[in-house]
Amino acid sequence: MIKKTTSFRLAIFGGSFDPIHYGHLICAMDCLEQISLNKIIFMPCSRSPFKKQNPVASALQRLEMIQLAIKPFKNFEVSSFEVQSPAPSYSIRTVQEFHKLYPHAELFWIIGSDQVPGLPRWKDYAELIQIVKFIVVSRSNYYPYEKRDYLVPLPKIRYVDISSTEIRERVKKELPIFHLLPQAVFQYIKENSIYIPNRTVHEK
């Protein structure tokens, strides 16, 4: 298992981020503070092996939206590793790469509690849990999971009921979204007509 003697703690926050919103940022900040992390890497995926559909926004658009959203946070960074790698995005490949880049760091991966039961189906699961620990963020309507050494529960949960799917649907219906994500991301979606071509993203 991962040794606990290292002083640098790095977490990878993977997802589609299609688009990134306040829920992602609050979750990341809670993990940073409660798990005493030094850095969080936002890792947009090209396509999840567990999802049939590709993200709606392009890889470049999602990277740029993340960059805009995390600009005020000095401990947050974004990586293009997965979107530049062949699809689908496998976590083991990402973890191996960051283990090489940060050989002396203690590595974590942020996941929702609903993902815990499916972890054994992740590619090279046995190797994965030797390299990385999973910070588990509990979500509503999901039962407690069995304790494991490689699972690190987030002590205090600030559940924010926002989803990227909801935001995309609101854009389609011409409903306001400015209250769900950072202003810079809202402006980017509006200016680039993301999620619904040739129509205006309404401010009110």
UniProtKB/Swiss-Prot annotation:
Q: Does the keyword Cell membrane apply?
A: no
- Which keywords does this Swiss-Prot/TrEMBL entry list? ATP-binding, NAD, Nucleotide-binding, Nucleotidyltransferase, Pyridine nucleotide biosynthesis, Transferase
Q: Which EC number(s) does UniProt give? A: 2.7.7.18
Q: Pfam families from the xrefs? A: CTP_transf_like (PF01467)
Q: Tell me if Manganese is a UniProt keyword of this record.
A: no
Q: Which reaction does it catalyse?
A: nicotinate beta-D-ribonucleotide + ATP + H(+) = deamido-NAD(+) + diphosphate
Q: What class of enzyme is it?
A: transferase
Q: Name one GO biological process term.
A: NAD biosynthetic process
What GO terms are given for molecular function?
A: ATP binding; nicotinate-nucleotide adenylyltransferase activity
Q: What pathway is this protein a component of?
A: Cofactor biosynthesis; NAD(+) biosynthesis; deamido-NAD(+) from nicotinate D-ribonucleotide: step 1/1
Which family is this sequence assigned to?
A: Belongs to the NadD family.
Say what the protein does. Catalyzes the reversible adenylation of nicotinate mononucleotide (NaMN) to nicotinic acid adenine dinucleotide (NaAD).
- NCBIfam families (alphabetical): cyt_tran_rel (TIGR00125), nicotinate (nicotinamide) nucleotide adenylyltransferase (TIGR00482), PRK00071.1-3 (NF000840)
- Official protein name in the record: Probable nicotinate-nucleotide adenylyltransferase
Q: What is the lineage of its organism?
A: Bacteria, Pseudomonadati, Verrucomicrobiota, Methylacidiphilae, Methylacidiphilales
